[in-house]
């Protein structure tokens, strides 16, 4: 415990584990970390005091809750990577004097900095920049924060000839604090927080360079964006770089082309074209989704893609989402292509008088939505402009909320286990600007927490990060190389039932407002296929594989028997191809392996004579002779059990 001798212990700090400790006012976050353990002090990168991210040198002056942040925390990574972006900018300014600075934030996987330069950067420049960055780290500059008035800040950045910084400062509302951070000779406009010094960054690497429009607007100048990553240990960097190499091999855009699953064309950027094999995977996912939902009392609906502007004004999308929507004129009126399925489901609910006996009402929809994304952020199937959301909207009474949430949690868990995904859960609570009463928020948040506890699911709390219309649970999948993907969401929504004046007749004969729960499992069918492609590296489990078996006759004289084998498999709805080309068997096997087909059935003289097949597995190689009946029994069982 932090020793105060005989001094007065003036405040109580509640730590991450719930323990309360007394400290004198003015103690820093770092000193509190050191009082807990030397190890924690060494690993600490910042703090979270009463929900606000603070620096290690921040003085605590009042009672409150404090989490010491390390690199293991998402907020800790953001602090670490934010400082790393400043190290990058300082190195670039040292080497390329005429470069102008734009912005340099921490992102989900590292950091970037945008530069305006006449000579585009190339990866050949990285060696010199990294060398300079390592010098800056070795020089161990303190990061010193200072504040200027708006007028002073503009003058300061004009003197430094940094037009992008001047533009940013001019956009800051009057009266807001304008802060800067200095490290050595380098100064940047920045709100922080940061590490205490550059020397705390132990391993840093530049990853790539790309073009990026200033403020993401295609009408603005194209800047040069350098991406990087950093870690507190070199071993962590090495592990990450290995993962990145593995990710390149698994890139769904590369595999999508090689396996003939989908394509994207300049005639429709962000609008994927699914090929026959890609459609097989898609249809399997959708059929499985439908079957499991019907089993659990859901009813499928289909709502129009284009709806009148009045609907979007009522739903709130017109005010909050208009710039991401596409519009068209019909009969002199404005219509929008739907960016979300929710308003359509509201109209279905509202189409008839509902009783409490009808609730819970579970409406599900595989709804095609369109959202305008800037061309620079489009990425294969992961970030598109047109996609299918596996939405469901559940309408219920207050008494039913917890059970309905638990039902959705169990369904999400069932789905992810089928695909072999581990996952973690995050609960996002009420933000400062929210709609709905205190009672509604308390009911909703407690119901989410209680359902998570009943499901025995550990969860992380993101205080104040819920939507303004309700708290939510997010499910983050972990793929086979350790990356996480946010897919499933359970979102309680107070806004839609209110805006659409949804009602049901209660047992008291009076009208009541239902509670609505919005949820997705896949998130987007397209993105989920992209994730699965990378998770399995294109080697889909047999039940999902577009082609499950390829029959390979050794020579032309085996074609007749091979066709009989092919037809027998077809009779059992096994997805099979016959490769009867005049090619050597070794070539045919290699090609089937490159296509990642689960099973090859090779037929030659011996197989024709004995009436069986020679089995070769994608996973286990040559498995020798097997009767066709036994193989059919084996593969049908594998498909039925959805074996991985």
Curated annotation (Swiss-Prot):
Its EC number is 6.1.1.3. Residues 251-541 are annotated as: Catalytic. It comes from Caldanaerobacter subterraneus subsp. tengcongensis (strain DSM 15242 / JCM 11007 / NBRC 100824 / MB4). This is Threonine--tRNA ligase. The gene is thrS. Pfam families: HGTP_anticodon (PF03129), TGS (PF02824), tRNA-synt_2b (PF00587), tRNA_SAD (PF07973). Its cofactor is Zn(2+). Catalyzes the attachment of threonine to tRNA(Thr) in a two-step reaction: L-threonine is first activated by ATP to form Thr-AMP and then transferred to the acceptor end of tRNA(Thr). Also edits incorrectly charged L-seryl-tRNA(Thr). The keyword Iron does not apply. GO terms for biological process: threonyl-tRNA aminoacylation. One of its GO terms (cellular component) is cytoplasm. Its main location: cytoplasm. InterPro entries: aa-tRNA-synt_IIb, aa-tRNA-synth_II, aa-tRNA-synth_II/BPL/LPL, Anticodon-bd, Anticodon-bd_dom_sf, Beta-grasp_dom_sf, TGS, TGS-like. It is found in: Cytoplasm. Residues 8-70 form the TGS domain. HAMAP family: Thr_tRNA_synth. Homodimer.
């Amino acid at each position: 415990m932090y020793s105060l001798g005989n001094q007065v212990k003036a405040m109580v700090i509640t730590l991450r584990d719930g323990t309360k400790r007394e400290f004198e006012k003015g103690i820093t976050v770092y000193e509190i970390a050191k009082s807990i353990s030397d190890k924690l002090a060494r690993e600490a990168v910042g703090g979270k005091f009463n929900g606000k991210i603070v620096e290690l040198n921040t003085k605590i002056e009042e009672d409150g809750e404090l989490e010491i942040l390390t690199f293991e925390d998402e907020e800790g990574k953001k602090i670490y990577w934010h400082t790393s972006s400043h190290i990058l900018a300082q190195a670039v300014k040292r080497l390329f004097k005429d470069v102008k600075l734009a912005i340099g934030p921490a992102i989900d996987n590292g950091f970037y900095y945008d530069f305006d330069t006449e000579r585009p950067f190339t990866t050949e420049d990285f060696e010199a920049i990294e060398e300079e960055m390592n010098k800056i780290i070795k020089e161990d500059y303190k990061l010193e924060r200072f504040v200027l008035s708006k007028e002073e800040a503009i003058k300061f950045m004009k003197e430094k000839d940094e037009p992008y910084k001047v533009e940013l400062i001019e956009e800051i509302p009057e009266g807001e604090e304008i802060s800067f951070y200095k490290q050595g000779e380098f100064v940047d406009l920045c709100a922080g927080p940061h590490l205490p010094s550059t020397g705390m960054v132990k391993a840093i690497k530049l990853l790539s360079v790309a073009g990026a429009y200033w403020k993401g607007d295609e009408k603005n100048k194209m800047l040069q964006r350098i991406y990087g990553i950093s870690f507190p240990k070199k071993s962590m960097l090495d592990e990450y770089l290995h993962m990145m190499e593995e990710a390149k091999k698994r890139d769904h855009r590369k595999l999508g082309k090689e396996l003939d699953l989908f394509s994207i064309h300049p005639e429709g950027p962000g609008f994927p074209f699914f090929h026959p094999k890609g459609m097989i995977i898609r249809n399997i996912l959708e059929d499985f989704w439908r079957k499991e939902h019907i089993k659990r009392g859901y009813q499928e609906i289909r709502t129009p893609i284009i709806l009148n502007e009045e609907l979007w004004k009522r739903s709130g999308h017109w005010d909050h989402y208009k710039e991401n929507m596409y519009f068209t004129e019909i009969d002199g009126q404005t219509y929008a292509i739907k960016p979300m399925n929710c308003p359509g489901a509201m109209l279905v609910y509202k189409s008839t008088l509902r009783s409490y006996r009808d609730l819970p009402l579970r409406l599900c929809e595989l709804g095609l939505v369109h959202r305008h994304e800037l061309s620079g952020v489009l990425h294969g199937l992961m970030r598109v402009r047109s996609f299918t959301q596996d939405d469901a909207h559940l309408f219920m009474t207050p008494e039913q909320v917890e059970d309905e949430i638990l039902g959705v949690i169990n369904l999400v868990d069932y789905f992810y286990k089928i695909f072999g995904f581990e996952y973690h859960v995050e609960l996002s609570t009420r933000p400062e600007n929210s709609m709905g009463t205190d009672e509604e928020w308390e009911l909703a948040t407690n119901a989410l927490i209680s359902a998570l506890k009943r499901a025995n699911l550990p969860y992380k709390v993101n205080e104040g990060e819920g939507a303004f219309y309700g708290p939510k649970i997010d499910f983050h999948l972990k793929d086979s190389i350790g990356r996480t993907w946010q897919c499933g969401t359970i979102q309680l929504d107070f806004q839609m039932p209110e805006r659409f004046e949804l009602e049901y007749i209660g047992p008291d004969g009076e009208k009541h407002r239902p509670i609505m729960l919005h949820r997705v499992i896949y998130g987007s069918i397209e993105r989920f296929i992209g994730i699965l492609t990378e998770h399995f590296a294109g080697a889909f489990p047999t039940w999902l594989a577009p082609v499950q078996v390829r029959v390979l006759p050794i020579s032309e004289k085996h074609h007749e028997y091979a066709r009989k084998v092919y037809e027998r498999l077809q009779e059992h709805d096994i997805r099979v191809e016959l490769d009867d080309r005049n090619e050597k068997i070794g070539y045919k096997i290699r090609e089937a392996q490159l296509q990642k087909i689960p099973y090859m059935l090779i037929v030659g003289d011996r197989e024709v004579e004995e009436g069986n097949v020679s089995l070769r597995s994608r996973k286990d190689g040559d498995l020798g002779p097997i009767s066709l009946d036994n193989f059919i029994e084996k593969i049908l069982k594998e498909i039925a059990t959805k074996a991985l």
